[in-house]
C-alpha cells in the first residue's frame, strides 16, 4: 500500500489548455511484508473537462513483481439518493468476514443503478472498463486501459458520498 507514502514531484507543467504533474515513489530498501524493489510513476493531466491518471510501475528488482493497482476516489453528491451509477458486470466478488475474496457469484441489476438508500461495500468483475456516475450536479465517466478490471463500491454511513474504486485485481491479490 502506498496511499500514505511520500511521492516526489518529478515534473510540473502548465500549458494553455491543461496542466500536468508527474509524481514518483521508489522503494530500494523493501520491507519484509513486500520484499520487492520498485518505482511508481503517476502522471496527472488536468483539463477544464477531465482529469486523467496514467500509472506506471517499474520493477527495479531481479525477480517478478506482483502488484495490483487500485484508485480510491470519493465522489460527493448533493443528494446521493438521486444519483445513479452504471457499469457492466455479471459477477460480484464474495468475501469472508475479513473482506478477503473467497469466490464469485452471479450479479444482475438494471442499469443505471439507483443509489437511493443503497449501502455498498461490494466488488464486481467488470466486463467493460467504463463506469458512469450521474448526480444532480454533475456526471462523470471513469475508464481504464487495463485488460482485466474490477470495481469496488463503498458508501460511508451518513454521507452523500460514494467511493468508486477502479482496480486491476481483487483484495488479497497475492492469494487470488
Identify the residue ranges that each predicted region occupies.
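Hydrophobic residues positioned within well-ordered beta-strands of beta-sheet architectures
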Residues: 21-23, 40-42, 53, 69, ...
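Short, well-ordered beta-strand segments enriched in hydrophobic/aromatic residues
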Residues: 44, 51-59
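Short coil/turn motifs at secondary-structure junctions
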Residues: 28, 49, 60-62, 76-78
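Active-site pocket scaffolds in enzymes
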Residues: 140-176
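Structural motif
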Residues: 18-20, 50-52, 130, 139, ...
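Active-site scaffold segments
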Residues: 52, 72-74, 161-167
